[in-house]
């Protein structure tokens, strides 16, 4: 090794050591000036020998070029959300559910943490080196923020210590301390820049900067709280043990993590944290309570998109009184019509509130609300303002009733409210302007029609300029019209036109999924396509006939039936076919003639597959006579469980359904 290589290695090791002491142990040994001197020395040596610069060098936190947009990263292990409780009674009920499910009379050991009010992120280390980072996004897919996360000094670019797994995905919260937030806003007011409403918004805005040099100037920090991918190594078998191991490897962990051996101890922890909340120096909105034992976590499993072994115990929201001046009705991307109260502006939890959600017609009836009423406003979870109750004793004489619309306030289509649901929805579907942008984005997405290069910003411009009203209009676009869009040159425009032409050749299942019918995901679309075979047969199906499809119940059947009953939707489908959208003729599969262990079986896939994509697995299973369903029920014959299988696996085990792993599936596919 050359002398300069030895110097570089020693300097990097020394700087990483002091970063660990400062950010993780909160026990710096040297003054900032000495740290800066060491960093300057390292930069000077690397300038002499740029060929010796390594990606994990402390000098390489900032250096990536500004991005034009964030790429998407699909989470190999989904980032689930947590269920919430808001009072002691609800927590005690949660504790009892856990004990009942474990069939135990002994107290559960809980690991309690602060619920940080920041941005959830996933950070992947390979052989101890940070290789990628992503936002939570929708839990399945997030944005690639690797360059920005590298600028956060609390996050090590390289882990130190022994027995570091080959692949380790650390999950945690990026947040902004109160002092840093105040400094950012102070600078913004002085320079005429953007002033943030709260530290969470500032943290999110800082982390989503396209230019990492801007992120580097923001005093963001990080605490880790969990793990996603774990390959080529082992971790302790308790949650606290894992956090302590992370800390030993150089990752920051909150010093308020506490083990509680009884429900009362958890409540004491909650009250103490609530009391200390104003002095923490950063925002939290509750505490997170997790079963400490990993074995018990696995036994408890998951439900929907949340674990059964953890809960967020939120702090009470702050409340104020004000008057409802009007009620307007907004239409969301799925057609949900939401009443919104326009309020006399009032400060709630440090934020000026002028609007509050009323959720739905049932909520208005429950509140007994009228326009002009004096109401109590709460910022639920410290974020979303809502009306808690009407102050009936101070009701003015001039109040008037709230009339829920019978037609969509945007497109005029009829509204529907399915039995058993609280939400009223517009039936306009593909022609409703309020739903148009999101419907089109879904239509062109990778798992739907898969139009390469047709990003969200292009869709936004096409709708705003009224170039596109329905999905069929996309296939009428010309390169000349696209060239007029922002950042769209002739070559890019022609590429999009070519991609649209290519997308016309699809499958019946993809086409159904692309239509965006409520509750019809990929698995349901595939089931409908396989059962009915043709669009004509599906359009003519009754609600009873639709329910014969595996995994389709009354709710889904009603949504499908109503979608095809709407004349405007049928018109758009006709236009799409006229523009050349097509798919192969159905292949009739006689299950009795197929010699396969999957023939005639209803199969559910869960977890991540490593040997093939989920789409490929579905296609091969269907080709061998299987019916692939999206959820586990008593009708399910077989569950194929990949890595990080969750609630579907747990339900299959409860019902005694046969479960195999990916390796066994591949063996049977070749049988």
From Swiss-Prot:
CDD domains: BRCT_DNA_ligase_like, LIGANc. NAD(+) binds at residues 32-36, 81-82, 113, 136, 173, 290, 314. Its EC number is 6.5.1.2. Keywords: DNA damage, DNA repair, DNA replication, Ligase, Magnesium, Manganese, Metal-binding, NAD, Zinc. Transmembrane segments: none annotated. It catalyses: NAD(+) + (deoxyribonucleotide)n-3'-hydroxyl + 5'-phospho-(deoxyribonucleotide)m = (deoxyribonucleotide)n+m + AMP + beta-nicotinamide D-nucleotide. It comes from the Bacteria. The keyword DNA repair applies. Zn(2+) binds at residues 408, 411, 426, 432. The keyword Magnesium applies. It is an enzyme of class 6 (ligase). GO terms for biological process: DNA repair; DNA replication. The active site is at 115 (n6-amp-lysine intermediate). Its cofactor is Mg(2+); Mn(2+). Residues 593-671 form the BRCT domain. GO terms for cellular component: cytosol. InterPro entries: BRCT_dom (IPR001357), BRCT_dom_sf (IPR036420), DisA/LigA_HHH (IPR041663), DNA_ligase (IPR001679), DNA_ligase_AS (IPR018239), DNA_ligase_CS (IPR033136), DNAligase_adenylation (IPR013839), DNAligase_N (IPR013840). It holds the Pfam family DNA_ligase_OB. GO terms for molecular function: DNA binding; DNA ligase (NAD+) activity; metal ion binding. DNA ligase that catalyzes the formation of phosphodiester linkages between 5'-phosphoryl and 3'-hydroxyl groups in double-stranded DNA using NAD as a coenzyme and as the energy source for the reaction. It is essential for DNA replication and repair of damaged DNA. Belongs to the NAD-dependent DNA ligase family. LigA subfamily. This is DNA ligase. It comes from Salmonella newport (strain SL254). The lineage of its organism: Bacteria, Pseudomonadati, Pseudomonadota, Gammaproteobacteria, Enterobacterales. The gene is ligA.
């Amino acid at each position: 090794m050359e002398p300069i290589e030895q110097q570089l290695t020693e300097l990097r090791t020394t700087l990483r050591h002091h970063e660990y002491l400062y950010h993780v142990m909160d026990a710096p040994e040297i003054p900032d000036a000495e740290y800066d001197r060491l960093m300057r020395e390292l930069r000077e040596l690397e300038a002499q020998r740029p060929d010796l610069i390594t990606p994990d060098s402390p000098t390489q936190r900032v250096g990536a070029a500004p991005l034009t947009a964030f790429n998407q990263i699909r989470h190999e292990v989904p980032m689930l959300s947590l269920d919430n409780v808001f009072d002691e009674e609800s927590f005690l009920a949660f504790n009892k559910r856990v004990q009942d499910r474990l069939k135990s009379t002994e107290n559960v050991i809980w690991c309690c943490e602060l619920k940080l009010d920041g941005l959830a992120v996933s950070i992947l280390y390979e052989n101890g080196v940070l290789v990628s980072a992503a936002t939570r996004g929708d839990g399945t897919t997030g944005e690639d923020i690797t360059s920005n996360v590298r600028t956060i000094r609390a996050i090590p670019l390289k882990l130190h210590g022994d027995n570091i797994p080959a692949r380790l995905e650390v999950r945690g919260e990026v947040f902004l301390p109160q002092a840093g937030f105040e400094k950012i806003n102070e600078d913004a007011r002085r320079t005429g820049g953007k002033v943030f409403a709260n530290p969470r918004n500032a943290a999110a805005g800082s982390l989503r900067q396209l230019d990492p040099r801007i992120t580097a100037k923001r005093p963001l920090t990080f605490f880790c709280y969990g793990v996603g991918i774990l390959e080529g190594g082992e971790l302790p078998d308790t949650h606290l043990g894992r956090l302590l191991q992370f800390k030993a490897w150089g990752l920051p962990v909150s010093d308020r993590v506490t083990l509680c051996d009884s429900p009362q101890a958890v409540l004491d922890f909650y009250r103490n944290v609530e009391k200390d909340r104003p002095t923490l120096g950063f925002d939290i909105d509750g505490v997170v309570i997790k079963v400490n034992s990993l074995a018990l976590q696995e036994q408890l499993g998951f439900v929907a998109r949340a674990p059964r072994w953890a809960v967020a115990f939120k702090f009470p929201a702050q409340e104020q009184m004000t008057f409802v001046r009007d009620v307007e009705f907004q239409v969301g991307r799925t057609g949900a019509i939401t009443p919104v109260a326009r309020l006399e502006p009032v400060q709630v939890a440090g934020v000026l509130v002028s609007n509050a959600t009323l959720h739905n017609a049932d909520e208005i009836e429950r509140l007994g609300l009228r326009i002009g009423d004096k109401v109590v406003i709460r910022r639920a979870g410290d974020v979303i303002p809502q009306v808690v109750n009407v102050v009936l004793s101070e009701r003015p004489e001039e109040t008037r009733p709230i009339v829920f619309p019978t037609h969509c306030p945007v497109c005029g289509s009829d509204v529907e409210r399915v039995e058993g649901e609280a939400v009223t929805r517009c039936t306009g579907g593909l022609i409703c302007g309020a739903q148009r942008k999101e419907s089109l984005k879904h239509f062109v997405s990778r798992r739907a029609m898969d139009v390469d290069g047709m990003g969200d910003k292009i869709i936004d411009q096409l709708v705003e300029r009224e170039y596109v009203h329905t999905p069929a209009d996309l296939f009428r676009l010309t390169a000349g019209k696209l060239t007029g869009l922002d950042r769209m040159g002739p070559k890019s425009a022609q590429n999009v036109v070519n991609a649209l032409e290519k997308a016309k050749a699809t499958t019946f299942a993809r086409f159904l999924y692309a239509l965006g019918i409520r509750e019809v995901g990929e698995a349901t679309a595939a089931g409908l396509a396989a059962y009915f075979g043709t669009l004509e047969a599906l359009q003519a199906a009754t609600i009873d006939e639709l329910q014969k499809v595996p995994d389709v119940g009354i709710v889904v059947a009603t949504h499908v039936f109503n979608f095809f009953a709407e004349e405007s939707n049928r018109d758009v489908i006709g236009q799409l076919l006229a523009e050349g959208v097509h798919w192969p003729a159905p292949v009739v599969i006689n299950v009795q003639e197929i010699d396969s262990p999957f023939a005639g079986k209803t199969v559910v896939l869960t977890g991540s597959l490593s040997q093939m994509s989920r789409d490929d697995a579905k296609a091969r299973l269907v080709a061998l006579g299987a019916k692939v369903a999206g959820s586990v029920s008593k009708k399910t014959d077989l569950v194929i469980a990949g890595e990080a299988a969750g609630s579907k696996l747990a339900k299959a085990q409860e019902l005694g359904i046969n479960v195999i792993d990916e390796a066994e599936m591949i063996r049977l596919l070749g049988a």
